[in-house]
UniProtKB/Swiss-Prot annotation:
Protein name as it appears in the record: Probable 4-deoxy-4-formamido-L-arabinose-phosphoundecaprenol deformylase ArnD
EC number: 3.5.1.n3
GO cellular component: membrane
Biological processes, Gene Ontology terms: 4-amino-4-deoxy-alpha-L-arabinopyranosyl undecaprenyl phosphate biosynthetic process; lipid A biosynthetic process; lipopolysaccharide biosynthetic process; response to antibiotic
Amino acid sequence: MTKVGLRIDVDTFRGTREGVPRLLEILSKHNIQASIFFSVGPDNMGRHLWRLVKPQFLWKMLRSNAASLYGWDILLAGTAWPGKEIGHANADIIREAAKYHEVGLHAWDHHAWQARSGNWDRQTMIDDIARGLRTLEEIIGQPVTCSAAAGWRADQQVIEAKEAFHLRYNSDCRGAMPFRPLLESGNPGTAQIPVTLPTWDEVIGRDVKAEDFNGWLLNRILRDKGTPVYTIHAEVEGCAYQHNFVDLLKRAAQEGVTFCPLSELLSETLPLGQVVRGNIAGREGWLGCQQIAGSR
């Protein structure tokens, strides 16, 4: 039996309003619990369009057929008008998710975090995280115990900033296995549970065709030597590609693969490491990557 952490990122208003309810229904039918990370502030995701001037981002948008994958409402959100606030407008949906699944913070403003957090000072970062946590806690009526940095934009600055909130774990980076990042003080910080597997948009049209993706991914899962963690998006697997996700769950069950919330992957003893800036094939720009202590 292979156990895989299932992480669901919710980036947009439409993903919350339409994608999450569909995913909740699918997961219920398959008796699966997951970790769902919500963006709760303004939906300004359309402001990423300026990144089309970067060849790597343009190629990603073309090979993943972004217009049909996400929809024009997502691609244009917050461009010519202020982005709609996601959280309180979809509070009932978020509360429903929290009844059955582990719920954490993805971001206050997903676009702002992904585009600008790498240049923020620590207090600006702390204030932004606090705003998101406060909003999510108001919605679900209980403390938030986990978070996942938008776009995996995380480095030592993010690790230090999040220590102020005493969360149970964070999932801010890409890597191979859960670990504790070393702080500037030399002490181990809050546990990190890295994503180990590629997302749909990172590999479609580059490594694999859409119709072959599920078999390709299951092969990666079964060969994973670490602690497998897979991320889906409410805007993708909860909308245009929900049928592909259902097929993945059916095929996974046949292969003895089970999915669980990320917290079930934690153990009392974890290796030490760091989160450093790196690059992942198929994703434009830098992102946080796990580095085991002592390695370079």
